[in-house]
Structures are given as C-alpha cells and as structure tokens.
C-alpha cells in the first residue's frame, strides 16, 4: 500500500478553490506562486498516479503572468481539463493512443466556460478509452492509480481529474459524465462529484446530437462550496433558460425532505458492506429530521442494463466506424482496447434491437417523473461495491470485464438516461480505509436542493481527507 498526496506548506496549502481565490484576490498569495506550487505538486505525485495526459505548465505560467481573467471569481486558481474536450494548442487523445496526436485549433465551449470562471489550466487529465470504462487501465498507457492507496483504481472515466484533486495538486478539475464518470471517481477518491441536469452546461456538438443525451460536463472538488461556487460562476457565463437557475447556494437545506433509500439495483443488492454504510447514512438523515422511506424496487426496469449496454456499444461502434474521419488518417482501430472493440461488436451484431432499446431508455424519464413526484431525493450507493484494486476491472476478456463493470457501476447510468442531477459525496469509508461514495439524486433542475442537502451532510458528518483520513462520527 502507498498513500500519495501533495499537501505541503506552500502557496496552495490545503485550501479549497473558494479560499484560494480569496487569498489571491486579497494579495496574501500571488497567482504565479500558486501556479508554481501546483506544478511542483503535479510533478511530485504524477509518477505514482499516472493521472496526467498532457502537461501545459508553460501555458499556465504565461496565463498567471499575464493575469488572464483577473476579474473572474476563481482568478488564478489552478485546474486541469479532462482529455476528451478540446483546448486550443493541445492534443485531445480521449484516453487512447489509436492515432497520432495533433493540436486542437480552438477551445471547446465547455473549456471556454471553465477558463472563463478564472481557473488556470495546467494541462489535461487521463481517462478511460473514450470514457467507456469505469476504470482507466489502458494496456499501453497504464492504469491511473488512486492516491488513497495506489494498489487501487481511481475510477473513471474522469480518472486523472479525480486523482489529482484528491492528492491535493489542484482543488478543482473539469470532469464529465456519460454513465457515472464524475460520480464514480468522486466515490473512489473521496470527492464531491455533481452530475448536473441534462443541458445545464454546454456540450460538444457530437454529444448534443445523441438520440439519448446522456453526457454532462461538470467538476470534481473536495468541498461542497467549491462545487456550488463553480456552478454559480459558470451560470453567469452560459445559461440554459429551459432549466431553473442553480443560483448562489451557500447554506444547508432548511426544509425537511422526503427521501427514498434504495440499495438494490436492477442487477443486484449492494455488497453487505456498502449496503450497511448506506443504511447508516439513511439513519443520519432520519436523525436530521428528514422523512426516510426504504424502497425495495430499483429505480429502473429489468431491461435497463441490456438496453444501456446496447446504447453504449452504439457509441463505441460510431467511434470505430468514423475514427478516420474524426481523428485523422492515422486512426488505427486495431489499437483500441478490448472493451471498446467488444462493445462495438456487440451492437454491430444487434443493430436490429437498437431502436427499441433507445425507445425504452427515453421512456425511463416518465418513470423518473413519477418517482420524484413522490420523493424529493433518492439515496443510493454510488457504486455497488467498495473500490477495487487495479486489474480487477481490466482483464483482456471482453465479457468478463463487461460483467464486472455492469455489476459495480449499475446505480449511476440511470441518472444519465433520465437527465436528472445526482451528486456523490464521500460520506463513508470501507474496512480497508478507502472512500465510499453515497449518491443523492433529485428531479431535473434541482441541483440547488442537492447542494443544500450536501452542505447539511458535510456539516453533520465531515468527510475524511487524504492527509487527515479519520472521519468524524
């Protein structure tokens, strides 16, 4: 076992993004000093974590020196961008090495929003290939390891972002989520991870055109207030007027809520350990005065996993078939990993079933509306078992890895399909000392409610930090 973190007495200290932004504004620390400290931290821990996809340290130094975005709230606070969105002048490799790198010509829209809040990007972070797996363990690029214990996975697909935030390199990093890719790394690395409502933040054109819009951009942080502040600031730059505003969420929820607790997915009951930890949190919510009801039925029909895997495979098939057009002539599908190719083969053999699967996935929104007509919030584990060790979810056999992944991450994709917000909070620890995430979901547009409830839980049960790992009981 090896715990890896970069928390030292430098310009970053152990400040979260809000506190660091205030220190920069007040002149207590300098922008250049903060960026240099983050670079030093990245260089110290990345050899053990393998979290960086591309280092843009000189670009960050230049941005700090020029004072870019000085009027923005997070001005000078360092961050990273996940390597599946474009940053001008930097390659976008999507967690693979299946083509020769080339520089993007312009920032993506979400990159402009992230940087528009004043955050200074130090580079790009690793992910699983095209974000299809819940672990980043590419056969040639190597695994992204968990800073709490490098024998364990950092989760995925926002693996590098999760590892670097948890290790203290930066307080906040870009992430996105098409089946759990914000929430799973949050659960594995002891972080706050909010997947927002469908359409809350801008998306790349290819994601906007999907028949079921499952992808959402967001961030990973160590504190609830950092996540809340990011959405407040992002909303000032880009607003979807079809959704109620998140607004400025700064305090715990006042009203007592109707909360449903579910520990059984469409495939299985959560492991005994994770189930017990979930029920313990349900007890805390009752102590806080919320009305908690234990619900036996899972939040999706029995057909959900098969339908979602078929749709996931449709996305893999699109990457395989359009790779040369999308990524250039050097694209070589034989270099793709076994999960990507296996998913593509699966859907290629079952294309006749895809239209009905898409229809059923779309209809799941009706079920969600009915559910949240009865309850304000749904509590489930983020994943069905505690974080696995590196290698468990990356065997070469496609069917084995698919079965293990489906069983582990079965709770998270439902919110992607229905488009509702969900937040993973690091409210528990496993017997081996690894963070365990608990997931709270609400109806579309109710991110503010989830953040308020998260504030209440953060106050009632402060979570472990990697350099102060004992959870307050």
Curated annotation (Swiss-Prot):
Transmembrane segments: none annotated. It comes from Mycobacterium tuberculosis (strain ATCC 25618 / H37Rv). GO terms for molecular function: amidase activity. It catalyses: a monocarboxylic acid amide + H2O = a monocarboxylate + NH4(+). The gene is amiC. One of its GO terms (cellular component) is plasma membrane. The keyword Transmembrane helix does not apply. It is an enzyme of class 3 (hydrolase). Keywords: Hydrolase. Disulfide bonds: none annotated. Its EC number is 3.5.1.4. Belongs to the amidase family. NCBIfam families: PRK07869.1. The active site is at 82 (charge relay system), 157 (charge relay system), 181 (acyl-ester intermediate). The keyword Hydrolase applies. This is Putative amidase AmiC. SUPFAM superfamilies: Amidase signature (AS) enzymes.
């Amino acid at each position: 076992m090896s715990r890896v973190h970069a928390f030292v007495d430098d310009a970053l200290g152990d400040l979260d993004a809000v506190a660091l932004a205030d220190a920069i504004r007040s002149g207590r620390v300098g922008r250049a000093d903060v960026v240099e400290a983050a670079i030093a931290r990245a260089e110290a821990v990345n050899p053990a974590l393998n979290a960086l996809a591309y280092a843009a340290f000189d670009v960050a130094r230049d941005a700090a020196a020029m004072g870019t975005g000085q009027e923005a709230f997070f001005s000078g606070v360092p961050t990273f961008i996940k390597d599946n969105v474009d940053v001008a002048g930097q390659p976008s490799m999507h967690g693979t090495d299946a083509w020769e790198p080339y520089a993007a010509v312009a920032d993506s829209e979400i990159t402009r929003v992230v940087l528009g809040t004043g955050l200074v990007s130090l580079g790009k972070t690793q992910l699983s290939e095209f974000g299809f797996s819940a672990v980043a363990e590419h056969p040639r690029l190597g695994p992204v390891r968990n800073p709490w214990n490098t024998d364990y996975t950092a989760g995925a697909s926002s693996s590098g972002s999760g590892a670097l935030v948890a290790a203290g390199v930066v307080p906040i990093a870009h992430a996105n989520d098409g089946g759990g890719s914000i929430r799973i790394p949050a659960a594995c690395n002891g972080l706050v991870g909010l997947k927002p409502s469908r359409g809350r933040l801008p998306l790349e054109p290819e994601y906007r055109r999907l028949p079921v819009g499952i992808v959402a951009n967001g961030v990973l942080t160590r504190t609830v207030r950092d996540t809340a502040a990011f959405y407040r600031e992002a909303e000032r730059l880009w607003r979807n007027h079809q959704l109620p505003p998140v607004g400025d969420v700064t305090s715990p929820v006042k009203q007592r809520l109707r909360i449903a607790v579910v520990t059984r997915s469409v495939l299985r009951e959560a492991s005994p350990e994770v189930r017990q930890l979930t029920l313990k949190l349900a007890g805390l919510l009752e102590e806080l005065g919320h009305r908690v009801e234990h619900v036996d039925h899972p939040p999706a029909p029995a057909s959900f996993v098969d339908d979602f895997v078929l749709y996931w495979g449709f996305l893999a098939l699109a990457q395989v078939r359009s790779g040369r057009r999308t990524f250039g002539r050097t694209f070589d599908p034989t270099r793709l990993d076994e999960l990507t190719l296996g998913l593509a083969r699966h859907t290629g053999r079952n294309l006749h079933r895809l239209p009905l699967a898409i229809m059923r996935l779309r209809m799941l929104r009706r079920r969600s509306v009915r559910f949240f007509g009865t309850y304000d919030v749904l509590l489930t584990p983020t994943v069905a078992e505690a974080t696995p060790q590196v290698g468990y979810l990356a065997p070469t056999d496609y069917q084995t890895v698919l079965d293990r992944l489906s069983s582990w991450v079965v709770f998270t994709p439902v919110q992607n399909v229905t488009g509702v917000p969900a937040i993973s909070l690091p409210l528990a620890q496993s017997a081996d000392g690894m963070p365990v995430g608990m997931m709270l979901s609400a109806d579309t547009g109710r991110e503010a409610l989830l953040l308020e409830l998260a504030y209440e839980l953060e106050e009632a049960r402060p979570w472990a930090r990697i350099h102060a790992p004992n959870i307050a009981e």
